[in-house]
From Swiss-Prot:
UniProt name for this protein: Endoribonuclease YbeY
Any Pfam family hit: YbeY
Main EC class the enzyme belongs to: hydrolase
Keywords for this protein: Cytoplasm, Endonuclease, Hydrolase, Metal-binding, Nuclease, Ribosome biogenesis, rRNA processing, Zinc
Cofactor binding, note field: Binds 1 zinc ion.
A single MF term (Gene Ontology): metalloendopeptidase activity
Organism from which the protein derives: Proteus mirabilis (strain HI4320)
Length: 155
């Protein structure tokens, strides 16, 4: 049995066009059960100011970013389904979707799946890691009926 629990926090003034809680759960369920059958994830939707502050504090990057992933780290003897937190910047997602000629929904789905894979320990710093992670993202997104998010970059 698999179960995905979502704690959705909306900390942005403009909520128009945000995905529904059901959409977020669909995207989480597309990736998490195959890795961690019972998972609890917090998704916090923020504006550029909060994203910028967190990105500067935790990554040393002086700009807002699309998604930040904060894995929950419990002591080994504590078994909790808490996977971690995803902080997603609404404005950056919308801007990137436009720049990449994707629908906003498609890019939201990509950012949730991308962030979840980070929570699960995947990364894209090294080329081989990036290839593996991008392959998983593409496979999951295509199962959901979305295009390969890296198609533009590959052409």
């Amino acid at each position: 049995m698999s179960e995905v629990i979502l704690d959705l926090q909306v900390a942005t003034e403009n909520t128009q066009g945000l995905p529904s809680e059901a959409q977020f759960i669909t995207w989480l369920e597309a990736v998490l059960p195959q890795f961690q059958p019972i998972s609890e994830v917090t998704i916090r939707i923020v504006d550029e100011a909060e994203s910028h502050e967190l990105n500067l504090t935790y990554r040393g990057k002086d700009r807002p970013t699309n998604v930040l992933s904060f894995p929950f780290e419990a002591p080994p003897e504590v078994e909790l389904p808490l996977l971690g937190d995803l902080i997603i910047c609404r404005q950056v997602v919308e801007k990137e979707a436009d720049e990449q000629n994707k629908t906003v929904e498609e890019h939201w789905a990509h950012m949730v799946i991308h962030g979840c894979l980070h929570l699960l320990g995947y990364d894209h710093i090294e080329d081989d890691e990036a290839e593996e992670m991008e392959g998983l993202e593409t496979e999951i997104l295509q199962k959901l009926g979305y295009e390969d998010p890296y198609l533009i970059e590959k052409e």
